[in-house]
Swiss-Prot record:
The keyword Transmembrane helix applies. The keyword Repeat applies. Belongs to the MPDU1 (TC 2.A.43.3) family. This is Mannose-P-dolichol utilization defect 1 protein homolog. Its main location: membrane. The chain crosses the membrane at residues 41-61, 69-89, 98-118, 126-146, 148-168, 180-200, 207-227. The lineage of its organism: Eukaryota, Metazoa, Ecdysozoa, Arthropoda, Hexapoda.
Amino acid sequence: MTDLIRQGALFLMSEKCYDNYFLYHNFLDVPCFKALLSKGLGLAIIAGSVLVKVPQVLKILNSKSGEGINIVGVVLDLLAISFHLSYNFMHGYPFSAWGDSTFLAIQTVTIAVLVLFFNGRKAQSGLFLVGYVVLMYVLNSGLTPMSVLFTIQSCNIPILLVGKLSQAYTNYQAGSTGQLSAATVIMMFAGSVARIFTSIQETGDFMIILTFIASTFANSVILGQLIYYWNKPAGVKVKDSKAKKPKTKKDD
């Protein structure tokens, strides 16, 4: 039983931290506390990521519509997630630092396929899925040099910003967040904030840290829109602009 507890604890902390906590009872060790907190947050984010975009998927399936969802934004978001996943996986970073990207990628590609399908592009939705599977094989099988993966990861910030902000622009034009799921938006924002801390602790990779800072900013914009447009039906912005249109002589 003691061995099982030890093995479980060592999954969350280093042997040095285990000794500090369980042998010397030094519970005020700051570096060990930070490492344990980071590992715990990372695992919590991974657990949450299993379902983070499921509300969005269900909302599309129930309405049989991708209204208000910018497909370009979804595809760019998918690329950013996939490049991040591959970069971390091939670098050999701890799974707790990037494991959520695996589940986010699966759910995001599902959203992209559903939006294409319900927009009447059924053949394209199938081709898109096949193309994505091929891309992931190329990125994660060792066929892609590490130098290329680093370059791709460095491009993640503009890809991520363009993808998220194009969705924000779509929301602005529509005067509504359409079929965007509030639960998904909130969890994505919270996850990106937590990932800044876990990335500092577990990888120290400046490129990854900067990526999550950019992600937090972009997610905060969409979260702000969600709050602003909460009780506003689609088309309010357009109607308001028409209502303010000055009268012409014909109207008189």
